[in-house]
Amino acid sequence: KRNFSATLGEGWNRYSNDHFGRVTWVKKPVDDFMPNHEYYNNNAKKTDYNAYLKATYEFVKGLSAFADLQYRYVNVRMVGPADATSAKRSFSYDLNETFNFFNPKFGLNYELSPLHRLYASYAIAHREPVRNNYEHNMDAELEKPRAERLNDLEVGYEFTAKNFTAGLNLYHMNYKDQLVPTGEV
């Protein structure tokens, strides 16, 4: 008996918010740093749409393949003065970036017995830069941050008993334009 199952779906999110910094307290107030002084204020909007198809096909009992296919559209808009303390210098956002991602994942599962399973998968995933990546790269000498791309290969073994589960997962992750916490490319 061969089994096939599939799920199709989509999602849409829109975020809109003002980002601001306000002086809450200073020991010795000066002109630009009086309590309640707003030292930056900008608006950011993010639209995130995705559509996906997940499918599984069982070739023979215990051996199945799967495919997850995702399309993702992301638009980021930021306008206005930025947090100079975080960015280490004063600047204003004038940003309108659009990203189109295709994120596929393919794999095999082989159930040797009810207790033992082997699996392997390959995936490509993308991630857009976040606010801090832009803030830390808004120097004229630095490149604007690019979307991150990850190629991920995994193989593993899983043992599942009534009251105990153990597994071994080996993976290789290869990044291009990795976005690290400092915002560096």
PLM features: residue spans?
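Membrane-embedded beta-barrel scaffold of Gram-negative outer-membrane proteins
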Residues: 111, 117-125, 146-185
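Hydrophobic, lipid-facing positions within transmembrane beta-strands of outer-membrane proteins
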Residues: 47-53, 102-106, 118, 151-155
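Short sequence motifs at beta-strands and strand-loop junctions characteristic
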Residues: 1, 39-47, 59, 77, ...
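Short acidic, glycine/serine/threonine-rich loops at helix termini
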Residues: 131-133
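Face-selective signature of the C-terminal outer-membrane beta-barrel domain
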Residues: 1-83, 111, 167
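Transmembrane beta-strands of outer-membrane beta-barrel pores
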Residues: 12-18, 71-75, 122-128, 137, ...
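Extracellular loop and loop/strand-boundary signature of outer-membrane beta-barrel proteins
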Residues: 1, 32-42, 84-95, 136-144, ...
